[in-house]
Amino acid sequence: MKSNKLMALGIVFSIAVLIVIGTIAYSIINDKKDKGNEMFAYSTQQSLGKDDAPVKVVEFGDFKCPACRTWDVTVLPRLKEEYIDKGKVQLYFINFPFIGKDSDLGAAAGEAIYKQDKDSFWIFYDEIYQNQKKDTEEWITEDLLLSIVKEKLPKVDVEQFKKDLHSKDIKEKVSKDSDRAQKLKVQGAPSVYVNGNLANPDFDSMKKAIDKELKK
């Protein structure tokens, strides 16, 4: 009888310990989410991948930035294949328009497109980099943007895009992204964060940072 009571107490104690551990783990996970939301406002940003992916990667970029184009061509495809498509990583893009006046126009275009169709933004993301010229030139024009929308983005309504491109809401969103970059003291583009931690943007460095987070 005594041994049965001890066994029952042991089971109760074990369950209590598991509950405490689970509560702590849940708290840690939510603390990370809260930290990320505070730093990056995940829910307001362009995203690629599953919402429940355990690792959040944030890219601050400018469509006029040559290094950002290189990142799009060399790093993103591998990141997508090895992590995003497998549900391990969700990628967020945050505007950091710092090179020229037309950087803001490119950022606004991305926001206006994403507002209509999320997948179309990532097509635009590739297309505008393919059209990239010297960063000293003001090459992001409304004509270029409209040609991309008309020729490459069938899910985006052209007239609505024109209205949104210069709308107050879109301008405020781009401005908030710029403010966020300043608060984080972003020094250049692409600047990449892995679960809130600044990482080198080359694939090997990102892979190490991501794998480290996946092991936690």
UniProtKB/Swiss-Prot annotation:
Bridged cysteine pairs (disulfide): C65-C68
UniProt superkingdom: Bacteria
GO molecular function: oxidoreductase activity
Signal peptide extent: 1-25
Keywords: Disulfide bond, Oxidoreductase, Redox-active center, Signal
Transmembrane segments: none
Database matches in InterPro entries: Thioredoxin-like_fold, Thioredoxin-like_sf
Family according to the record: Belongs to the thioredoxin family. DsbA subfamily.
Function: May be required for disulfide bond formation in some proteins.
Protein name per Swiss-Prot or TrEMBL: Probable disulfide bond formation protein D
Organism from which the protein derives: Bacillus cereus (strain ATCC 14579 / DSM 31 / CCUG 7414 / JCM 2152 / NBRC 15305 / NCIMB 9373 / NCTC 2599 / NRRL B-3711)
The gene coding this protein: bdbD
